[in-house]
């Protein structure tokens, strides 16, 4: 197997797919900014942590179970099939509290996120609708991860991009021609993963398919084994929720709703950026796990180096685009032409995105550690960048430098985490079953 050729095949297709996934919220934000102005952008940014939490569970279960599946398949273990069925069953159970919250207390959730009375009134039905579709968001992650690990990254990419295209088109149709407003945007976003799952299901009718659904009761043991390898994905997604929540409260204190709206612009482009680096990590994961399952450690390390090199190159391209087109990007979400919001978002984009020179390598390394069955190290890396370092840096730097301190927290936290990650990667690695 030509590892380099396979690496770029899997990674390129996965990047496109995950960029498509991030467009769920990016499209929402653009159309809602046109329909509801600054308050609409503020609402979306307050909802982001809820999306992140849903995606975090989907990522942990889906990527973790698929990684277990890939390792066991490479070792010829028949029990590999049980992980797919268990992932679907457990995701549906975990989705129940989200659905109940959406049905009975969406307003309370928005208040907890820092929304005032106007924002709560604006976003009540939007929040209710997307929370009720939680099982589909989670299962979409699982289907995509397993189809990719079963040797069909192209179908996974097509499924994700098709769902995203549906979301973009019907966001516009539901919000404007049909005049459904924000609930229409939520409905378009909620239906998108249903379409993606339907397309992924084609894999089960192909000759290359080795996946089967095993009739079984949900197993806590299999779930824990899956989550051990998917924890880096969970913390990676959760880190976005933590970062967004902490930044929202700091910015509300420093600049009010306009500060949160400015961060909404930064955060939405950050979703796309993070998706690119997750695409590198998740695209390499099936190949790394296969090498690990066959005890080809040199091949796994080669893939890690390819991943980090690719991440650095992409970070340079990404920052060049952000630096060169900052005003254009900000204007897309500034339908009210607020000079203050534009000023905040302009400096925020240019400072915040410096962090991706470090974050790209951290995301790839955390994915590698999970793929080679080193969940403890993967968790340490992910918790550092997602919780410990970012919260500490944001509190300290915002107190010292105000708004610019908030933006600087992300690159500072990622730089600290990269030093820790290099130390963890240099620790001796053993082959485990």
Where are these regions (language model features)?
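Membrane-helix interface/capping residues of multi-pass secondary transporters
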Residues: 29, 38-41, 153, 182, ...
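Small-residue-rich hydrophobic transmembrane alpha-helices
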Residues: 41-100, 137-156, 262-326, 359-381
């Amino acid at each position: 197997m030509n590892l380099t050729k396979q690496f770029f095949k899997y990674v390129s297709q996965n990047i496109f797919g995950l960029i498509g996934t991030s467009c769920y919220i990016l499209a929402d934000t653009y159309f809602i900014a046109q329909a509801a102005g600054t308050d609409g952008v503020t609402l979306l940014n307050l909802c982001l942590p809820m999306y992140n939490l849903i995606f975090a569970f989907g990522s942990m279960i889906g990527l973790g179970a698929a990684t277990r599946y890939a390792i066991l398949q490479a070792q010829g273990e028949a029990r590999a099939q049980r992980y797919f069925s268990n992932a679907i069953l457990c995701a549906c159970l975990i989705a129940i509290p989200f659905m109940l919250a959406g049905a009975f207390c969406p307003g309370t959730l928005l208040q907890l996120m820092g929304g005032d009375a106007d924002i709560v009134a604006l976003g009540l039905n939007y929040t209710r609708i997307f929370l009720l579709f939680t099982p589909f968001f989670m299962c979409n992650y699982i289907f995509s991860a397993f189809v990719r690990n079963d040797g069909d990254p192209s179908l996974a990419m097509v499924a994700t991009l098709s769902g995203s295209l549906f979301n973009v088109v019907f966001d516009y149709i539901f919000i404007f021609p049909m005049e459904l407003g924000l609930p229409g945007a939520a409905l378009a976003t909620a239906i998108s993963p249903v379409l993606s799952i339907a397309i992924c299901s084609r894999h089960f009718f192909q000759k290359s398919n080795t996946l089967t659904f095993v009739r079984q009761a949900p197993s806590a043991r299999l779930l824990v084994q899956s989550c051990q390898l998917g924890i880096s994905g969970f913390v990676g997604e959760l880190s976005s929720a933590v970062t967004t929540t902490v930044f929202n409260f700091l910015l509300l204190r420093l600049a009010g709703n306009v500060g949160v709206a400015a961060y909404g612009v930064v955060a939405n482009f950050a979703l796309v950026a993070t998706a690119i680096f997750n695409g590198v990590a998740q695209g390499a994961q099936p190949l790394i796990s296969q090498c690990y399952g066959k005890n080809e450690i040199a091949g796994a390390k080669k893939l890690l180096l390819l991943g980090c090199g690719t991440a650095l190159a992409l970070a340079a391209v990404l920052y060049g685009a952000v630096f060169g087109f900052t005003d254009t990007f900000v204007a897309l979400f500034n339908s009210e032409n607020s000079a203050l919001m534009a000023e905040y978002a302009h400096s925020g984009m240019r400072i915040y995105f410096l962090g991706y020179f470090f974050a790209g390598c951290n995301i790839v390394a955390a994915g590698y550690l999970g793929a080679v069955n080193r969940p403890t190290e993967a968790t340490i890396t992910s918790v550092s960048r997602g919780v410990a370092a970012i919260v500490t840096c944001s509190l300290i730097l915002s107190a010292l430098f105000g708004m610019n301190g908030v933006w600087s927290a992300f690159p500072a936290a990622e730089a600290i985490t990269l030093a820790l990650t290099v130390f963890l990667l240099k620790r001796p690695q053993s082959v485990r079953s």
